[in-house]
């Protein structure tokens, strides 16, 4: 993107790009560590439920007292969004309902939004993106997180004239992880409870990485941004290393494991018996591409590309992602170019709540990474037609029916407040896209 010279010029002229950060957790702290070493960039406001903790975070990532004193800290995110001393908002709370509210307020106030909050994006991103476009502001995925990095690879492949067969990321997966809870998660990671606590690791958040929910959310986000298909019955998580991507993730008709030619999928870094996969992609992202003619296929071989046995399918991948350390790219792309680093375009994929165990009438759902539900990726048209409850709203609401373990929870199975802003917005989005498909 060749941004650095523009940033230097802004630094020289005293005209930095200014940011309001909402949520100073892990992602936010990684961004903050880079913000003070980047010319032409300034954080003017930080909104967090605990402003004093946010100040300590700034100190911990290397900010000086002078730099901390130059920022306005608050626990009132909506009021912060309404101010006029910044160019772009970074929404990094991870709370779906709050994320929707913050994004809508940002759009109302003409601010670009970098949506770190994939939970909110999958819950309501298709409609948020439409509202942002109508208001003339950028609604963007967060560069550094796996969805944006995957979208970049997809865009590269398509812009080069290749067909995208599959795209996604890697993770650590075994089928039994779907039932993991915050009480069992550290055993699966091989980390002691004491070490996790000392490192400040949130058991519910880390459990959402393990139980498949986060993978489902990220693949839904990619599907919605790149018009790729979700599998018909959830992610399959095939064990696969970097060198085998083109072999495993080609269509079933060509000898691979893909249900759909042009879908999202997550590959596991471990075999089903627990053995490690060779050259795993646990922390990375990939795209599998197909040559559209014999000449391009021949070039794959000539230039050392790793292909399947036919020579027509190959893969490009990035074996890492640096989370908030790379977020600046989204900020600069939105403000200097007016272009998102990936953005929702349609409603292809949805993530629905699945019971982890038998649930009784009156039980309160505890959402992503909890003890009651995990999130499963499904085609959005299936989710809407069957009136399934999105995982982003499966928190703090009571069941009015008993649910058997492994079954999806529906809107009719819970007591919800139709006047709740996030629920009302989601319902309006479902109506919009249902009508569009008719």
Protein language model features and the residues they cover:
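C-terminal catalytic/substrate-binding lobe primarily of soluble NAD(P)-dependent oxidoreductases
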Residues: 1-10, 188, 192-438
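N-terminal Rossmann-like dinucleotide-binding module
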Residues: 1-61
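Rossmann-like NAD(P)H-binding beta-loop-alpha module
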Residues: 140-210
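Short, ordered loop/turn segments at secondary-structure junctions
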Residues: 49, 94, 118-121, 144-145, ...
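Conserved N-terminal Rossmann-fold NAD(P) cofactor-binding segment
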Residues: 50-83
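Rossmann-like NAD(P)-binding element
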Residues: 72, 79-99, 112-116
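Rossmann-fold NAD(P)-binding glycine/threonine-rich loop
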Residues: 93, 97-105, 109, 117-138, ...
């Amino acid at each position: 993107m060749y941004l650095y010279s523009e940033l230097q010029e802004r630094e020289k002229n005293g005209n930095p790009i200014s940011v309001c950060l909402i949520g100073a957790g892990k992602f936010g702290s990684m961004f903050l560590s880079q913000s003070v070493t980047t010319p032409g960039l300034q954080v003017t406001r930080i909104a967090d439920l605990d402003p004093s903790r946010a100040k300590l975070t700034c100190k911990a990532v290397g900010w000086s007292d002078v730099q901390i004193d130059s920022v306005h800290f608050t626990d009132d995110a909506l009021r912060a969004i309404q101010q006029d001393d910044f160019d772009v908002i970074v929404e990094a709370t991870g709370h779906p309902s709050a994320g929707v509210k913050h994004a809508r307020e940002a759009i109302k106030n003409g601010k670009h939004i970098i949506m770190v909050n994939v939970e909110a994006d999958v819950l309501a991103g298709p409609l948020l993106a439409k509202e942002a476009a109508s208001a003339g502001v950028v609604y963007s995925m967060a560069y550094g997180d796996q969805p944006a990095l995957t979208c970049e690879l997809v865009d590269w492949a398509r812009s080069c004239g290749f067909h995208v067969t599959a795209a996604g990321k890697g993770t650590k997966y075994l089928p039994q992880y779907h039932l993991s809870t915050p009480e069992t998660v550290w055993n699966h990671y091989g980390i002691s409870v004491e070490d996790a606590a000392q490192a400040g690791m949130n058991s519910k958040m880390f459990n959402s990485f393990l139980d498949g929910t986060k993978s489902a959310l990220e693949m839904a986000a990619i599907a919605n941004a790149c018009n790729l298909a979700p599998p018909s019955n959830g992610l399959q998580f095939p064990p696969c290393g970097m060198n085998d991507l083109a072999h495993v993730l080609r269509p079933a008709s060509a000898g691979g494991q893909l249900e759909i030619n042009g879908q999202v999928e997550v590959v596991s870094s471990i075999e089903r018996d627990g053995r490690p996969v060779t050259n795993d992609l646990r922390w990375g992202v990939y795209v599998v591409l197909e040559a559209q003619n014999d000449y391009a296929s021949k070039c794959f071989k000539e230039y050392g590309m790793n292909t399947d046995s036919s020579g027509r399918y190959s893969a490009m991948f990035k074996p890492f992602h640096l989370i908030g350390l790379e977020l600046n790219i989204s900020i600069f792309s939105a403000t200097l170019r007016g272009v998102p680093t990936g953005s929702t375009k349609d409603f292809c994929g949805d993530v629905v709540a699945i019971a982890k165990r038998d649930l009784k009438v009156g039980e309160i759902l505890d959402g992503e990474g909890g003890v009651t539900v995990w999130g499963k990726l499904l085609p959005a048209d299936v989710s809407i037609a069957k009136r399934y409850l999105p995982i982003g709203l499966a928190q703090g609401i009571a069941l009015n029916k008993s649910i058997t373990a492994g079954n999806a929870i529906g809107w009719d199975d819970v007591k919800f407040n139709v006047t709740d802003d996030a629920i009302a917005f989601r319902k309006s989005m479902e109506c919009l896209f249902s009508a569009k498909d008719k």
